[in-house]
Amino acid sequence: MANHKSALKRNRQAAVRNARNTHIRSTMRSLVKMVRVAAASGNQEEAKTALDRAVPYIDKAATKGVIHKATASRKISRLVKLVNTVG
């Protein structure tokens, strides 16, 4: 347990940031999964729609520092490649 006032504040800030980052990461994973499921079903329109929702969210997560920029770029690249091979 932290004893200093500043350390207590840091603990509170870390908890809030952790909750925010966990939510962003979880939502991002759900959106990526929706793209993969739509692509697996063979429905290109649905896959493109899901991709259009996922890409800005992944970019936003990278901008906020939740994931690395290169990781975001790699995820987007793989999803676009997957959607383009559907149908």
Swiss-Prot record:
One of its GO terms (cellular component) is small ribosomal subunit. Belongs to the bacterial ribosomal protein bS20 family. Residues 1-21 are annotated as: Disordered. HAMAP family: Ribosomal_bS20. SUPFAM superfamilies: Ribosomal protein S20 (SSF46992). Keywords: Ribonucleoprotein, Ribosomal protein, RNA-binding, rRNA-binding. The gene is rpsT. GO terms for molecular function: small ribosomal subunit rRNA binding; structural constituent of ribosome. The keyword RNA-binding applies. Binds directly to 16S ribosomal RNA. Gene3D superfamilies: Ribosomal protein S20. It comes from Syntrophotalea carbinolica (strain DSM 2380 / NBRC 103641 / GraBd1) (Pelobacter carbinolicus). Residues 1-12 have a biased composition (Basic residues). This is Small ribosomal subunit protein bS20. GO terms for biological process: translation. The keyword RNA-binding applies.
